[in-house]
């Protein structure tokens, strides 16, 4: 065997095979060095490399890691609606992994933001599965294009931090398929992540790590996943059951490989199943071999910082811009002919930025430039007052007084507000959507002293805006912007670039408007997903709920017009949408064209509309472009629990094209043939179901003809009786028609048996 060739599982002993199915320590695979299988490193995280300085000892220190580029977490990056940019972020992350000899980076996380109080919302992409999947795939493809693996997580239904290690998420098959699976499914089918990390929680009574239906039936057999499945850290509670379910790798190791050996010897695990799981680990090592063999590689720190800078720019969402208060005029620095505005900067976040979330994804950045640092570097003058401390302690009157005095003497005030890290992190959920009260009070005091206030928010998940929005002419939602957030904010605030971010999550007026609150965060060890598929805007828009800001919303310094929307069928249940978008302003900027599909009459309750396509277009002043978005069959389908499959009903569908879920420019319609699925009819099928079925309709017609001929009793023809009739299983016809009803039911069953042979 050559040194460059890894063995087949056939070359290993039983004990060696078993050893491959658990880690070597908290951050390494367990290799078999004697057989040429190295124990490569795997480590966090979703928005940049977090390689612990103590990793070699198997310890975990979330605040002590090698310097790496801190890109915007998913809460910000998702607002870019720019998969190409996200792909560049993935490529840069991979290059840093190569330098640090990390074979697999643990991310991205594509769990749905079921409830905005989720403590880990900063690390996830969206309330919408289509957007989450079509953005996060950029990380997977970008990283793996460089020969480094990703770990798509947390599969599945890890949608809260409360009791996350054991809570039983009780979810309907339809909600799983339409909301909680699609981001995973899309990335698996299109990008084949090299690893997937299962979640801690149970799904309908079974822990994810021991869930054969989840890890094998759905993930591998149905979706065609080719990689390995690892546990979240400490999520494997039964080595044998997990391996049988389809878990390749226990992390971190529990040093119980002998349990696998004994289970194979006594027949609880078949040799073939162990071989499959162990061979998957060998295949993973093979995939990463080339990249891990590169020595003395050094990534370009400045180039990666520029990628982080661009990512931060496109993450910023402008929520309000009354009186065109933005962009600000920095004077000769930005415009040689302009007089500078006197600027006050208030808020500790401007000096001490909150640029990432807390927990396992915490990164030590290669650089860190605050907004105040950026102003100094660019020669832009501003008076600063911290106003408050970055904790949950009561307000400091001296800091408040200083801030108000600073505001009085300014032409415009930039107030940097938001959530301190103590308010949201991995490990716990939030209990309110509000900003800390001391910050709202300070804003009111400052607005009373100066009407020209722009609020710049720093937060990992949405916060309510309506209670204090009247005190600000401008609002920028900047999320957590990574290490280059300061320069990015300056670029947007002073007009070097127009904001182009769009919300990936609705901002509700009140947390109690969210439909999941009736089952949040659960009770007695379980949480019921009673809202079903009506998550986020699917609920708010369907039921006409007022919101602070709708899904997909975001303002620009430019203005745009969408015209010429047209749809053309490309198949029985597929279509293509074309639209022209025009920049009608004198500002170069980007706009995101969003396509929503609205079903017509359906057999099940469906959301008013759902995002099924988008594209981001950069347009110079006055420029127009035509965009094309393809809609596949899944764009029109829902998961039918009756058929246990995706189902497209025949009929007319509305295609809405706009710039948010509530800003629809034009609507067109397309008529689809449907997939023709039918379910066998029985005596328990209603008369209405018989009428709607192709075979059943012929039999219903035969019943009517036989009634006219006197061969069968005639059915009632008045509207009220027909209503009762249509809702009745045909075996109940005797209750309506007596003995004649029994004859009709038997006739229908007999005729169906003939037609369906």
From Swiss-Prot:
Gene Ontology MF: a single term: hydrolase activity, hydrolyzing O-glycosyl compounds
Q: Which residues form the active site?
A: 232
Which Gene3D superfamilies does this entry report, sorted A to Z?
Answer: Glycoside hydrolase family 3 C-terminal domain, Glycoside hydrolase, family 3, N-terminal domain, Immunoglobulins
Ordered alphabetically, the record's keywords are: Carbohydrate metabolism, Hydrolase
Documented EC number(s): 3.2.1.-
The annotated dependence of activity on temperature is:
Optimum temperature is 40 degrees Celsius.
Top EC class per UniProt? Answer: hydrolase
Q: Does the keyword Cytoplasm apply?
A: no
Q: Which domain of life is it from?
A: Bacteria
Per the record, the GO terms for biological process are: carbohydrate metabolic process
What's this protein's family per the entry? Answer: Belongs to the glycosyl hydrolase 3 family.
Question: What does this protein's UniProt record list under function?
Answer: Catalyzes the hydrolysis of a non-reducing terminal alpha-L-arabinopyranosidic linkage in ginsenoside Rb2 (alpha-L-arabinopyranosyl-(1->6)-alpha-D-glucopyranosyl) to release alpha-D-glucopyranosyl (Rd). It is not able to hydrolyze alpha-L-arabinofuranosyl-(1->6)-alpha-D-glucopyranosyl (Rc).
Outline the subunit composition: Homotetramer.
What this protein is called in its record is Exo-alpha-(1->6)-L-arabinopyranosidase
Q: Which organism is it from?
A: Bifidobacterium breve (strain ACS-071-V-Sch8b)
